Amino acid sequence: MGVLNENSIMGSAAAAGGEGYQIERSLKFYGAIPHLAKASNFQPTSPYTVSVWVKRASLDLGRTQFLWRINSADCLYFTTSSTLSWERRPTTLTTTGIYRDTANWYHIVCKSESGAMYLYVNGSLVSSNTSTTANPYTSGAMNIGGNAPTPASNTCLDGYLAEFHWVQGTALGPESFGEFDSKWGHWKPIEYEGGHGSEGFYIPFSGSSTKHSLTAVGSAVHSTAQQKIGASSIYIPGAAERVEASAPSIDFAFGTGDFTIEGWLYWTTVATDKTWIVNRESNSSNAWYIGMDTSYYIAMATGNAVILNSNTAMNAYHNQWVHIAFTRQSGTLRVYINGVQKNSAASTHNFSLTNKIKLGGGDTQGAGSMAGYQDEVRISKNCRYPDGTTFTPSTTAFAEDSDTILLVHSDTSNNSTTFVDSSGTTGDLGSDMSANSNNFNRPSSGSMDSTHIMHDTPTNNFAKFHKAHKDAQNNDNSYLDGDLQLGGGGGTSWRESFADFEVPKTGKWYMEFRHLGGYAHIGLMSSPYAVNTGDTIQTGHVWYDYDTQQTGGTIFYNNSNQASSVGAGSGEVYAISVNEGVVKMYKSNSVVHTYSQNLSNAGEHPVHPIVQTYGTAEWRVNFGQGDMDAMGAKAPDANGYGSFYYTPPADHLALCSKNLPEPTIVPTKHFDTVLYTGDGGSDRTITTNLSAVDLVWVKVRSGSEDHRIADTVRGGNKHLKSNDNSAESTGTTIIKSFSGATFNVGSDGSVNGNGSNYVAWNWKMNGSGSSNSNGSTTSTVSANTSAGQSIVTYSGSSGNDTVGHGLSQAPNLVIVKSRANADQWRVGSIQNIAGTTMDFTDYLKLNATTDLTDESTTWNDTAPTSTVFSVGSDSATNHPGYTYVAYCFHSVEGYSKIGSYYGNGSADGTFIYMGFKPAWIMLKSMDTSYSSWLVTDNKLNPTNDGAGTNLWAEDSSAENPNSYGYDFLSNGFKLRATSSNLNNTSKFLYIAFAEQPFKYSNAR
């Protein structure tokens, strides 16, 4: 069987750029069980540094959650109000910011100097004390994930920890462990390159802490007949003799990442179609193996196709030692012989299968083993020999390090059949990977074991369920086991929980659920507000529902029965797959229903995984992070990420950040908020982070002054006010001009009063505009089509008109103001939520608090198209001789969102999923009079503090601090107040722009 045929060389995609430093594993902590205890007492001394990544889970406000503590003294913990406290006795630092974003990761650094303490979150200083003294330390117990010396159930962490460094003797800042990404701006990890001091440690909670158990098969032995490094070498006679791992390991599923496979070989027989190292059991294109092809080249192959050969026949190396190395570096595959590169090729091939690693042949595809000797076989998860540079192969034994995932020495007696993997350590969850062996032990009781090592990390964030994301009735499940177990709360009501990721409507996706008992459903739903009282599905929403218990297994779509008796029962593993919008339901790895209704029916509404429980019913879920405790997870997705109980369907992916679609635009290039203090001068330049400013909205924060709005189409010296209906004014003391990334203001108190504080919201469009004749009336348009935003000016006429907007699709928000006369601002959008419809047969007024007004003459009762919006005969939008400006927007994934939500009237308010961390939000009730246009941003609120700061678009008053609670989160916006201005039981329109897409955001 020609498994290594040189004529089947596989083409590959263009080389991908490097991903930077990757964190591979985290450790899940929850409830009364989780903590790790240092094996010996610990006595810290200042200075020291602690660096750790944390992802929060259940926000149990009734208890303190310790990340670490030493002997009732130094500690780091989340308080009952979710602030962060660091104690270094006798001083305690407590943040004003509240940290309760459970959808993503925080990085925390404690920098301790002899007379100062500095606390950082995500690279930014959040609290400090520069006049403190350190308490004399005494040696004592140290715990990770719980109180010390004795952890109690009400002090343990609910969440995940990753990459824990304690650097003893040195005070370091966050720049030693992370950096701001130059493109997206999020804080990301870098590899720490320093030491830890004799008492310090590094706990990566990584799979590298586990050795692979190796077994000799057939006549494979250690032999003293040939030696390269030690007293013996590994002898493989041929045929199916081999040394193999006792179990499959995900370690060798490289995905698209870097690797090195190397070793010393001594062929006694040079034969084609023989293998050296094998990681396959089938001809899958996602498996890999290395051996001799039909031209006597050493080659790496996948399936039955060679992806790189040595281009050098190996006959010349018969009966002598030769060093072979295959590497991949940032998408380039290379092969070296004796340290010299012999060939290379672009390869981003995805090696995703989990199989037993084998030295020699003997796989199910009939590949025989290379006959001869091997020594110092090493596999690494990085590229050790970069750039094609010639190197001298080591003639001494390799030393294990954190990048080694397999290392087999041979230095033993003749004919020994004991083979040992010398990679990693034989320690435990808390193995110290520094040079100090300052290990931590798991508790003597409970289930804290290696199955709690998870794939969810700061460099690959996985979906889980989201306590902030409740159902429309504000019912709440119990959240257990890192938010991966839902329900069990009792009672006589149904409760829904939603995942913190949406399911993309394109691509292939897979997720699993184990039913633990009771009346329970799984499914996909487009919004918590898709279902009204009586299970009525709102127009434009979708609900894919699998009742797995109550009716013996019934499939529903939008509450309509699709199939009955398809299978039910507790203890089973159920699954959902989505293939380009086609939804399938599974039970025990078999498809029980394929929906004819495509996910695209949800339109712009995000679709989330949902579980429903009644009474004491419970679900356990796995999005691929590897819930090995209860799911027995083992199979990665098609990209090699995660672990599932069953092998996902072909090409299907886990819901994790690495798999999310790449955002099309960088938000900070299209919207920017600037805070500045006025100087009273007549010509003040304000600089933004945009390449060009085309629309600016300025408001004084510290006093009562009009809002000022100017743009490059009308000209910098022409101004409108959002807070009244007055006509456009012209003058040089307000916003004077635009120039690239800057705009200039004069001395007017609304934009530049001496000592006054201001906020400027800035959008990039496309300069001063150009003529557009798509409509019945000619318009001038400055359109940023990639960002879905445009400025339009036009002149009115008698009758009804259409106006070209310049965007690539229909806008979902149009704001129009008459420039020539005093008339109301008109706001149109299309929203349908819980019985309230806004659809361009009505309007809101930006300068007023009134609710929707139904009227046909503003928009001519006509929704926008991909080229025009419509206006009727109302003078606010169309009148002979009047001039107008319109600001048009549509949602752009990862950058902007125009949507609606249903307030729940609770202090634990509505969560609005946006798919990004918001930078700016404006919202207004559609069906409540006397509710304001609330405007807020991430600069007015640099941290979540429980009481947001905002302004009112229709009101000239100063900013309103500490009045309405809300949180900016990594994937949306959470309301924490009951006011009619943001969260009474009415329906709200919102407009939001992003700081970062969810794929590239930190927890906030």
Regions found by a protein language model. Give the residues of each.
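Low-complexity, glycine/proline/serine-rich flexible segments
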Residues: 1-46, 81-83, 210-255, 431, ...
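Charged, alpha-helix-forming regions
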Residues: 206, 448, 456, 465, ...
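Extended recognition patches within non-cytosolic domains
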Residues: 2-25, 30-32, 160-211, 228-232, ...
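Short surface loop/edge beta-strand patches of beta-sandwich-type extracellular domains
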Residues: 30-48, 93-100, 148-153, 188-193, ...
